Regions:
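Active-site-proximal beta-alpha core segment in soluble small-molecule metabolic enzymes
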Residues: 34-201, 215, 223
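N-terminal capping/small domains of soluble enzymes
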Residues: 1-75, 81-85, 270, 318-331, ...
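Charged (often Lys/Glu-rich) extended helix/loop segments that serve as interaction or gating elements
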Residues: 223, 237-377
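Glycine/Thr-rich phosphate-binding loops of Rossmann-like dinucleotide-binding domains
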Residues: 110, 132, 176, 212, ...
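A short small-residue
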Residues: 2-6, 164-170, 205
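Glycine-rich beta-alpha junction loops
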Residues: 126-130, 170-174, 208, 241-243, ...
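Acidic, glycine-rich loop-and-beta core segments that form the ion-binding/anion-interacting portion
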Residues: 186-242
Length: 377
């Protein structure tokens, strides 16, 4: 079927665009010899893992469930980092992960020997205290007082011999100039530890918008080579968004039109339920064939069927009047959508579909009342 024939609401993964992103990432790997992992926190649609696995080295996880998903569905390198690990989970994690990164030396001291006995490569996350985030403090791991990563003041030289690698993750949707700035801070504060003979790898985390049209890939590759050559380490990069950037849609139908001073489209999709970053970040998601408010002839506010007054996606304009029953297509909806959605107000989760490289769509998963009630008791 075609995309306009899909049931709504429905997420759609565009496999042609997904492959294009993967080809860009693989070229970085081929040019530099670095390793690239899928950060599953952004995109976990495992039916695409066979495709992703053709290009990338494996997966990285934020806890046990993601680690199990990567292990079972991709079966390549499997890394995990979490702010803390439960004692009840560490055994299973060491059975399925090759790399385990700790957030503190107290956790490393507790578990490192056990991990080593299981043949797991052990790392520590550092905080270079170099903030490059700008306006989005909620996504800044280097914000004052951040719980994420060990600062230089708290770095324990007495435990450094237990380490195999060092990890940092400070970026969010950023270009490689910010990585270059961050690396200078990492080298200044932690360079002497990177030079130790037991340190075999450096993981530069995610937030690298490598597949964005204006991303400076040449600078990224220079950064990677510099760290490889200076410290004789394997460099890992673990993008999430860059893997599936602009490779998905959320198809929604106009259910009603309300005008209480602002012409408002009531959609069967919701910002609060189906694209929570719209309210959390906040941001205005791209919408196919639309413009900014008042840019085109007909302007509408887009909202949803929930009772939340602030469940507003944004104001958009169109060349033609919108009618009840029309379908709209939000773009760049593969990332941080399905992994974060919810059933507030009893809203149904959108179906999930894939679009093959010829443009044909097939529904992979549908949801109903059963999924809603199963989570609640």
């Amino acid at each position: 079927m075609k995309i306009n024939e899909l049931p709504t609401p429905c997420y759609v993964i565009d496999e042609k665009k997904l492959r294009k992103n993967l080809e860009i990432l693989k070229k970085v790997k081929d040019d530099t010899g670095c390793k690239i992992l899928l950060a599953q926190k952004a995109f976990s649609n495992f039916f695409e893992y066979p495709l992703i696995g053709q290009y990338l080295d494996g997966t990285t996880a934020s806890g046990l469930f993601e680690a199990k998903l990567g292990y079972e569905k991709m079966g390549k390198e499997n890394h995990v980092f979490a702010p803390a690990f439960k004692e009840s989970e560490i055994g299973e994690l060491t059975d399925i992960c090759e790399h385990l990164v700790f957030n503190s030396f107290s956790q490393l001291e507790k578990y490192a020997d056990f991990c080593k006995e299981k043949g797991v490569s052990v790392g520590i996350r550092v905080n270079p205290e170099c903030s490059t985030q700008g306006d989005h403090a909620i996504y800044d791991p280097c914000a004052p007082g951040s719980r994420l990563g060990v600062t230089l003041a708290n770095f324990r030289e007495d435990l450094v011999e237990k380490l195999d690698g060092i990890h940092f993750h400070t970026l969010c949707e950023q270009n490689s100039d910010d990585l270059e700035t961050t690396l200078k801070a990492v080298e200044e504060k932690f360079g002497k530890y990177l030079k130790l003979p037991n340190i075999k790898w450096l993981n530069m985390g995610g937030g690298h918008h490598i597949t964005r049209s204006d991303y400076d890939i040449d600078r990224l590759e220079r950064c990677i080579r510099h760290m490889q050559e200076t410290y004789d380490v394997t460099v890992y990069v673990e993008p999430g968004e860059a893997v599936a950037l602009n490779a998905g849609y959320l198809v929604t139908e106009v259910m009603d039109i309300v005008d209480n001073g602002i012409r408002t489209l009531i959609l069967d999709a919701s910002a609060a339920c189906h694209m929570p970053d719209v309210l959390e970040m906040p941001y205005r998601p791209p919408l196919k064939d639309s413009g900014e408010a008042d840019e085109k002839q007909y302007t509408y506010r887009l909202s949803s069927m929930t009772c939340l007054a602030g469940d507003v996606i944004g104001d958009y304009s169109f060349d033609h009047e919108i009618q009840i029953g029309d379908k709209l297509y939000f773009e760049d909806m593969a990332i941080y959508s399905m992994v974060k959605n919810n059933t507030f107000n009893g809203m149904c989760l959108p179906s999930i579909a894939r679009m093959d490289e010829s443009g044909e769509c097939s529904v992979v998963k549908t949801f109903g009342y059963e999924e809603f009630v199963r989570r609640l008791g």
